[in-house]
Amino acid sequence: MITSRLFLLTLTVLSCVPTQARPVIATVYHEWYEGRPDYCGGIYRDNKVSAAHPWLPCGTQVNVEYKGRSLVVPITDRCECDSIDLSYRAAKILGVPVDGIARVHIHY
C-alpha cells in the first residue's frame, strides 16, 4: 500500500516537471517516401505534419522549435541516430531547409 502511494506521488511530481528543450539534428523526408507505409501503421504524406524519431512512442506529440518558430508534430515513424526527420510540410512551416539539415530543439 505504501509502495503504491509512493509510486503515485513520484508520478505526480515528475509530471509537474517542465520538459527541457533538447537540441537535435533535423532532416527532411525525401520525396521518395510519399505514399509508403510508416512504422506506426499509417501512410507517409508530404502534405501532412508528422515526424520520425528513433525511440519516442508512436503518437507522441513533440514540440519542434527552429529560429523562433514552433510546431507540434506527431511521431509516426522511426529514424536512425539521435535525430528527428520532419515531413516536408512540417519543415516548410518551421522554415527548416527542405534540402538540408538543421539544428532544432524538441520538447516531449
Model-based region annotation:
Residues C16-Y108:
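Secreted/periplasmic proteins
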Residues R5-S15:
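Bacterial N-terminal signal peptides
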